[in-house]
Each structure stands twice: as C-alpha cells, then as structure tokens.
C-alpha cells in the first residue's frame, strides 16, 4: 500500500507541474480503488451499490476542481480519501 501511495503522490506532483499524462495515469489508477470504496460504503449503509459510479464521478470532479488545494509536501492518498469520504457521506445524507 505504501508503494501505491508513493506512486499516486508522485503522479499528482507531476500533474500539478503540468504533466497531463501523469494526471491521466493517476485518474486511471485511483478510479477502481474509489469505485470499490464507494460500493463498500453504500453496502455498509444498506444502500444500492448502483450509485457508486455517480459518487466516483463526483469524487474525480472534486479532485480536479480542488487539486490546487492539495499540499504537494503531503501524501496524496489521505487527501483523496478525505474527499471521497465526505462525498459519500453527502450522498448518503441526501438519500435519507
């Protein structure tokens, strides 16, 4: 897991510096992990997992729009998963 986090952090640093290929690789790498996390979160809450794709798209959009707020000296994964957690909770609140 540490290798994955280091890889994601490096890709995000490169993306922030303007490397669009690194940004594409990062999004491709995080998407299945986010999808699995969204499906798990929905299932634990007793919600249909078919909403996972919508949540993943919301997360990826938020990452794109907020990428300038990420501290490049910090690991990327905790920042990403904080966004994911917050958007999943928002989705669950809106469903109730």
Feature roles, as predicted:
Residues 16-17, 40-46, 57-75, 94-96:
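Sigma70-family region 2
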Residues 1-2, 17-25, 36-58:
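Short, charged helix-capping/linker segments at alpha-helix termini
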Residues 4-10:
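Acidic, Ser/Thr- and Pro/Gly-rich low-complexity regulatory segments
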Residues 20-24, 28, 32, 36, ...:
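Generic detection of well-ordered alpha-helical segments
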Residues 11-15:
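Hydrophobic side-chain positions on well-ordered alpha-helices
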Residues 34, 38, 42, 67, ...:
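Hydrophobic-face residues of short alpha-helical interaction/recognition segments
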Residues 51, 75-76:
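A conserved beta-strand->loop->alpha-helix hinge within the catalytic CA
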């Amino acid at each position: 897991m540490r290798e994955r986090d280091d890889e994601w952090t490096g890709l995000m640093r490169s993306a922030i510096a303007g490397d669009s290929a690194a940004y594409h690789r990062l999004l491709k790498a995080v998407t299945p992990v986010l999808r699995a996390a969204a499906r798990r979160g929905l299932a634990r809450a007793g919600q249909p997992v078919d909403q996972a794709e919508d949540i993943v798209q919301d997360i990826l959009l938020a990452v794109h729009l907020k990428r300038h707020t990420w501290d490049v000296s910090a690991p990327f994964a905790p920042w990403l998963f904080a966004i994911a957690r917050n958007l999943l909770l928002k989705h669950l609140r809106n469903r109730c």
